[in-house]
């Protein structure tokens, strides 16, 4: 009787370990799928400047639409009709 109880407890422990390992594997695959779905591309290393930000005219980094680096004021300004 004692040995059968020990075998039942050992079997339950083994089943618990197997289920836990299976769940960990499933969780890692779910995390992998989610990270693939929600993977965002890294922004370019361009350092885009916004409106009225200090800039260098020879190295125009005012990259939003209709923004250019002003040669006189040396900041990004809007140019209409560009």
Swiss-Prot record:
Belongs to the neurotoxin 10 (Hwtx-1) family. 08 (Gtx1-15) subfamily. Residues 22-46 form a propeptide. InterPro entries: Huwentoxin-1 (IPR011696), Huwentoxin_CS1 (IPR013140). One of its GO terms (molecular function) is ion channel inhibitor activity. This is Toxin GTx1-15. Residues 1-21 form the signal peptide. It comes from the Eukaryota. Pfam families: Toxin_12 (PF07740). The presence of a 'disulfide through disulfide knot' structurally defines this protein as a knottin. Its main location: secreted. Transmembrane segments: none annotated. The keyword Nucleotidyltransferase does not apply. GO terms for cellular component: extracellular region.
